[in-house]
Each structure stands twice: as C-alpha cells, then as structure tokens.
C-alpha cells in the first residue's frame, strides 16, 4: 500500500500543469483532482488513451471502458453515452483525440435528442500523434 501511495505522490509531483500547452500528465492530474470516486471513464484508441489507463485511479469495478484490443477510433463518445444510460448516477468522462471526436456527429445528435449528459474531452493531436511518437 505504501508503494502505491508513493507512486501516486510522485506521479502528481511530475505532472506538467503549468506549461502553456496542456500536457497529458497535467490533464490527467487536473482530472484526478476533480473526478468523483464513482466516475466512469471511456477512452478511444490512441496515444492519450494508452497513457490514461495508467494515469487514473479507479475505485469501483466496471469504471474503465476502452477498445484498446481493437483500436476503435471514435469509440469513446458513443461508449460514454451507453455507460451513462447504464449507470445514470455515475459521472462519465469520455477522452478522445480530435480524430475520434470527428467521428461522433451522429452520436452528438443522439446525446442532445435524449438529453444524455457526459463530460467529453477532445485533445488536439497536433504534436502528440501516435505515428510521430513511434518514429525513430
């Protein structure tokens, strides 16, 4: 337990929260600070979401929903709507890149039509793209 506590402390100390461009570590720290413990998180495929699986604290079972085994870009927003319907008392956070967010037009109209409220965070991958990060 102490080792886990030390990891969390070091993770928060190393988060980049004061840079002009919001870095993923800073985003994750800010979200950790505000997320209720009963939150559910949906992720898209991509760099941000690979990082997110290690960066969030999960307090309840069935609180992380991700397509990482299938690489489904555009999964997060639609999954968030389904999670919110299944768990109406949970605060649902959906994280995705700008490409995944661009695939959510029909789901946006569904959310508005049925008054399904989730928190959606779309990150611009101008300099964080997976292909760029994998280049040597």
Give the role of each language-model region.
Residues 2-78, 83:
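Active-site diphosphate/adenylate-binding microenvironment
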Residues 50-125:
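Thiamine diphosphate
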Residues 46, 100, 131:
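Anionic group-transfer/hydrolysis microenvironments
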Residues 126-132:
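Conserved small/polar residues in nucleotide/adenosyl-binding loops
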